């Protein structure tokens, strides 16, 4: 790059010796120290040794300088000021440097990067064939035309493109992308030199089939006004914005332009969720908010009503507590109605009350919660911890990527009952439903314990089954389910009589009267 620069250089993304930065200033600066290598020849015993040392030489030649803010602040030397004059500002006190323009790489356009990576060079021939083609109405003689056509054909077939770390700075020619590679469906543009969301739009607007877009590690300026043009991202299903500096407000502002988006990755952006999505992100099924400081559970509640959200990744967000205010003990929350898979790795979860709350999620089937104080090996036997989590979350099918087999669940729930059986009795628990009155403290600590006492390896089975009346069963279920006795209707099914349901219509009769046996299934309706 020459010392002559255009006026719009400020804000551009650049690369210097593999390190990325943003230009914050261009102009004349008084003498500035530059880092140069220097050599010293040391003759010793007839052998010439060459030592290469790094030293700062303060030799300044007047001219243009660029003030840059490095992505890696350890790469810089100052905060954008020099000898008391502030030329630009940095977020970090050592994030800035002054660099000569000829040391800086401003990158290449999208098509140049595509051709550099994907065009296969033909084997050199002794003599290129001469060919005549018609352009307009005139015949034109060409040399090497076959090679050009072949290259264009290669690019037009591309559907998945990876241009990671290829110094892409923008779209280039206005319609060039649409003409050369119109069939691209997936692009990895991570760690490039894109400066703004407008740069992204200029590329995406030419790719009408674009479904997957990865923009990670591009420090982008997002619009403060109007949302994305309608139609630009009409097919986009996956968008990755990890480490782009995007804010939650900017996400919501742009999201109206993502009408069919299903997966959104926002890792490591210092995001604070400040408002509830209104009429945007309603199609999102997966949301990754990892490595953003979302310690306050109230931030999460702002996204709790996204209707299609099935997977939520919250690794390393610093969260330690959780309470769904709309659901009491043994009840399900209305929040996160479709959530099936939750990732909570690398957080500060240390209390079992957090796990208890997860049982309130009505659709949760899979959980990852590795590397938390509660689950760290050494804090408690790892297998016991796994058993307790399984017992506390009744609908869980997968824990830390390991499928929970039926045998494992039965064993976990049995061991959990045994582990806290004495505590249950001391708290007022009793096998006789009329005497079963565990205190609120126990129920809060073990919300599922009462229901586990009802179950055995095959459906519902009561240890006192032979003497229990239908009325007693209803009384027990009324307290457990918090439903009026008068609203409960009981019946059962037996493997011995497939397809037949028998109603328990006489409250005064015992279950033995109806010939209920171990292995039968008690049905409860209200």
Language-model features: where?
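Long, contiguous C-terminal flanking segments immediately downstream of a protein's structured core
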Residues: 2-9, 17, 92, 101-526
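A short macromolecule-binding patch
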Residues: 74-102
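Short, acidic/hydrophobic/Gly-rich beta-strand patch recurrent on exposed beta strands
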Residues: 67-69, 491
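Short, solvent-exposed secondary-structure boundary/capping segments
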Residues: 30-46, 58-67
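Acidic glycine-/aspartate-rich tracts in secreted/extracellular proteins
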Residues: 29, 71-76
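Short beta-strand-centered aromatic/proline hotspots
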Residues: 19-30, 44, 50-58
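Short coil-to-beta-strand transition motifs
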Residues: 13-20, 61
